[in-house]
């Protein structure tokens, strides 16, 4: 069984596109091979800035022979029908078989297709993959029609086995497949002939090309850590930057430098962001001081001076960049110390959304809402309002203009320079959080108040102008904002009536529709934590469903009890009681909720169930009143055994109508006991 090696060698592939391109190449080729009848043992895709490669082991040498039977017209059908059938099968009349059918004799065509050699199939599949490759952006070059991310120079397409290797005959736009590639652009630019994947990977390594992106990442991570350790520093983790840099180099050579003393007073976030965004440097931190004092740059070449010239050049560019940052910082500090009034005035001319006014209008709404929310989260109301009014002023600062990702972070520095209390400054930094499902959730009361007000103003505002998420489209990130509100409420245990809060934020918003949207997002959030959607539906029908903390406490307690054997059996009993009642009420035209009388109990099982309900109902009610849903669910679970025994021993639909009605009313008590906690009829199972 041969192995297949493919390499597509081109000019530099953007780093951000490489991971997806590896997956696309593997899928396009392997799916095409399997569809054509070939199988394989394993496949792996690789990338460097100048190449995409695919190695497939254990490919079958040819596709299997196939035999297809096709039913045609009756033997006495008109000649035109027979001729059409012959054209569709490519056979002659003599090659058809007449067979008996329930409608008479019918022509059958048996079409045998011999297997095709792997090389023929590979050539077709690879050409189609190259022409249909889904690059996010592509280009044409020269006079050809082929599109690729950057000009494509050469193709390796090689089948190899124990007897040797052969090039698959293939040519695309004048580029013929071969068995040669090139090494590192500067250190080993000559052609390299290869005979298979192992030979290919080994020769590339000797030619200063590290083929595996994961290996390049590991090499950068380890060497950067070693360089930092030698100076008593540590590398600030940044997996996104690591992945990007690994896609920029074929032979990573990390080099470490120090930041000039005159820049060390800049906030560490400014240093880190400037170095990352402008130069793709990793930041090195002094663990004793917390300051960013050094950097690691990753060269793509080994030099006789061990990178000294490269490092000096990078330090010159870095000094220029940090000089700009220092200029922004100094100017911003002067404005902050003056009270930031000019920034506040400037936001009047910045439109937030055409129907929702300026950023200044938005800030006024957030401040008013933060004042309302403050008591719910235990925040100082004056500080919450003050924090809301200054939290977005850094949007007008020069630093945030240069580095938008520093919004909020710089706001804290400027608030402190303005002499504002630390809780107010912290809220300026934290009010955008959480930005995603894994982002940290603020816990300081003032920060929580402003973060909630910010997100709720956004949500109620867009609901008021009917700009809601639709399908996969969510241009204003409203789903993320709703998840942020949910996490802020749940993590901090904030007891808020969302319906009332929506009305205070924006009376013209459709509060019921927005609450339904929150419930949908809550289902997604809890599903990730192992709570089923039907359990959420069951508790949503209960009073207080706009208090998310209350709702989640109910749902998690119910989810826990339903995972037990008692809970599973109890659910069956409650659902059975509900189903029997629903059928009887529909048939009799009455609602059985008149109260069952124990004096009509004929069996021990009935009397036991009466006693169990008499004991459980008040305990469940009290537990629900105290919001102790663990105790409430344990109370309902205590009914499992008497309910099971009742259904086992008692005939509900007795011929004696007095007994029948009493037993149905007893079932009503069971249903009502369950409804103290949830609508069990909505739970699957």
Swiss-Prot record:
InterPro entries linked: DALR_anticod-bd, Gly-tRNA-synth_bsu, Gly-tRNA-synth_heterodimer
Keyword annotations from UniProtKB, A to Z: Aminoacyl-tRNA synthetase, ATP-binding, Cytoplasm, Ligase, Nucleotide-binding, Protein biosynthesis
Domain of life of the organism encoding this protein: Bacteria
Residue numbers spanned by region Disordered: 58-77
Enzyme class, spelled out: ligase
Assigned EC number: 6.1.1.14
Pfam family, one: DALR_1
GO BP, one annotated term: arginyl-tRNA aminoacylation
Biased composition range(s): Basic and acidic residues: 66-77
Cellular localization per UniProt: Cytoplasm
GO cellular component, one term: cytosol
Family statement: Belongs to the class-II aminoacyl-tRNA synthetase family.
HAMAP family documented for this protein: Gly_tRNA_synth_beta
Protein name (record): Glycine--tRNA ligase beta subunit
Phylogenetic lineage: Bacteria, Pseudomonadati, Pseudomonadota, Alphaproteobacteria, Rhodobacterales
The encoding gene: glyS
